[in-house]
Amino acid sequence: MAKTALQFRHNGRDVAVFVDGGVNLLTTLRDLVGDMTPKFGCGQGGCGACTVLIDGDAHLACLTLAESVEGRSVETLDGLKDGPNLHPLQRAFMEHFAAQCGYCTPGMLMAAKALLDHNPQPSREEVVNAIAGNICRCTGYEPIINAVLAAASGGRARA
C-alpha cells in the first residue's frame, strides 16, 4: 500500500510523516512522531487513555484516522508543560493525588484541559461529564474531579 504524506502541528511544532492508509493517530504519534504520552489501552475507544486534543477538542487517537489531522493542530500531554513549569492541571493532579498507577493520567489530563479551555469555571457535573469517557481503575475518580475543580479555581479548593 502506498504511503501518504501527512503534515500537522504537534505540540506547537510542524511535523511531516508518511503514513499507511487507514492507520490511526495513536499509532502515528507513538511510532512515527515518538510521542509516547497517549497510551494504548483498549484500541476501541472505550477507555480514554489515548485522548488527545485536535484543534482544542478532545478526541480518541485510537479511533481517529491519522489522515484526518492533515493541517490541524494535535496536542498531547507532552505539550502541556511550559519548559520546566507544570501546567496548572498537572500541579493539581499532584496536589490532589489524582494519579496512582498513572496509566489513565495523560488521557484524563487532556480531557480536563479541553473542558477548561472551553469552560474555565465548570461545575462538578460538567467535570464528571468531561471525563466520563476516561476509565480509571485506581482512584475512584474523586481525586481527579477535585483536581480539575482546583485547577479551574486557580488551586483553591471548591465544593
Feature map (PLM): residue ranges:
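Signature of N-terminal electron-transfer/Fe-S-associated modules in redox systems
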Residues: 1-159
